[in-house]
Amino acid sequence: MIVSTKLQDHFEKITKILSGFGVEGCISYGEITFSIRDQRDIHLILKKLKKEYLFEQLTDVTAVDYLTYGQSDWQVGKVVSQTGFSRGRQQDFKTAAVDNRFEIIYQLLSMANNVRIRVKCKLKDAQIILVDSVSDLWPSANWVEREVYDMFGIYFNNHPDLRRVLTDYGFVGHPLRKDFPQTGYVEMRYDENLGRVVYEPVEIDDRVNTPRVIRN
């Protein structure tokens, strides 16, 4: 793939700025990405990027859960008829612990240098996954970090107001985790006798209707 001279120039300059840290970088599909090895360096590295390469805007923070990465919901058998693949056989869904299950991703924009980069870091597995908040660097981080906490259960140290932002305050679990059931845990309805909304355990069976199949 041909990389533009300007993009390559930005990549080399930023790589030089981050040379003292455990960071790996690449240019892929016309985008610059840097991977941080140690999550304890996230705040310092992002602060350095903002100050020394004028990344004055944080456009997004998100995360990825790799718990079931590379696993199929169904195991597809060999072709046994003219109609195509044999019937899918449902298999036990494995949710065994994986190393560095979660990855956090930051999208940065420098309007002064007209360049965007992606900075990501695999997070160490722990009962409480904790990352330093960057809301002191970019006010825009406040709500997107709350969203990551709400959806993935990743906590942000020194965040000014780490509360759920998309789900109810009494919500159980984190919906974008791979081990969160698609049906959820509770459902709500309006109870005419009580005159209010009530929560009840879901009565829907959690099953795979459109399976993810990986054919190698």
From Swiss-Prot:
Q: Which UniProt keywords apply?
A: Cell inner membrane, Cell membrane, Membrane, NAD, Quinone, Translocase, Transport, Ubiquinone
- Kindly provide the name given to this protein in its UniProt entry: NADH-quinone oxidoreductase subunit C
List the InterPro entries hit by this protein, alphabetically: NADH_DH_suC, NADH_quin_OxRdtase_su_C/D-like, NADH_UbQ_OxRdtase_30kDa_su, NADH_UbQ_OxRdtase_CS
Any one GO cellular component localisation term in the record: plasma membrane
Give the family, as the similarity comment puts it.
Belongs to the complex I 30 kDa subunit family.
- What job does this protein perform? NDH-1 shuttles electrons from NADH, via FMN and iron-sulfur (Fe-S) centers, to quinones in the respiratory chain. The immediate electron acceptor for the enzyme in this species is believed to be ubiquinone. Couples the redox reaction to proton translocation (for every two electrons transferred, four hydrogen ions are translocated across the cytoplasmic membrane), and thus conserves the redox energy in a proton gradient.
Asked if the record carries the keyword Iron, the reply is no
PANTHER family reported in the protein's UniProt record? NADH DEHYDROGENASE [UBIQUINONE] IRON-SULFUR PROTEIN 3, MITOCHONDRIAL, NADH DEHYDROGENASE UBIQUINONE IRON-SULFUR PROTEIN 3
Query: What PROSITE patterns is this protein classified in?
Result: COMPLEX1_30K (PS00542)
Q: How does it assemble?
A: NDH-1 is composed of 14 different subunits. Subunits NuoB, C, D, E, F, and G constitute the peripheral sector of the complex.
State the EC number(s): 7.1.1.-
Fetch the HAMAP family from UniProt.
Answer: NDH1_NuoC
Tell me what gene encodes this. Answer: nuoC
Q: Which top EC class is named for this enzyme in its record?
A: translocase
Q: Which reaction does it catalyse?
A: a quinone + NADH + 5 H(+)(in) = a quinol + NAD(+) + 4 H(+)(out)
